[in-house]
Amino acid sequence: NIKDFKEHIISILTIDDFVNYNNGNLIRYFYDLEDEIDINEYKNTRTYKTLKINNEEDIIYYKKIISAFNNFIEFLKDDELFIDYTYLWDIICTPNPKLFAKGLNLIIMEISDDDITNNIGIVCPTNYHTNNIYNARKPCLFLIKKDDYYEPIYSRFEGNKISIMKTFSEYKVSSSNQEMKNILQKIIKPYFNKL
């Protein structure tokens, strides 16, 4: 469920990864100058080790990072707030052995109620919001988005035993996923490569 997924994301977040997500924009979105920050709690990070301790600008910047990191975690914990997919895109797509070892290509197909043609849009964050572009070597996770709700698209195969495929790949070729491979190569990959 959503609560468990958010708790898992919080448990794997590190300040060193956080500074890179969304091209560093999460710091700008979530820091608060009013926060009281004790950097001593965060001395065992790669980011801290790159600081010049005598440089006041470095210390101020590191306090912004810590503030943003803590506020982002509080944001994720709040079940009343809507979490825009752009905040989570890099967390989900970046390789992380505790989440998705190879990372993912996240493909969100949006259904709009105001489109009389029943078209489905492909949602893709701009380079401003992500470090992750489509990579054919990563597995692809498909989601359907309608309003603020997301549902995964899985493939189910029945044979000697039921098998559920949660991600798809251009490189795993089998008769059972040939249609998905064609969609990835002919529609999804060219769309993402245009951006």
Where do the model's predicted regions map?
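Papain-like cysteine protease catalytic cores
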Residues: 1-120
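Deubiquitinase catalytic domains
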Residues: 70, 74-195
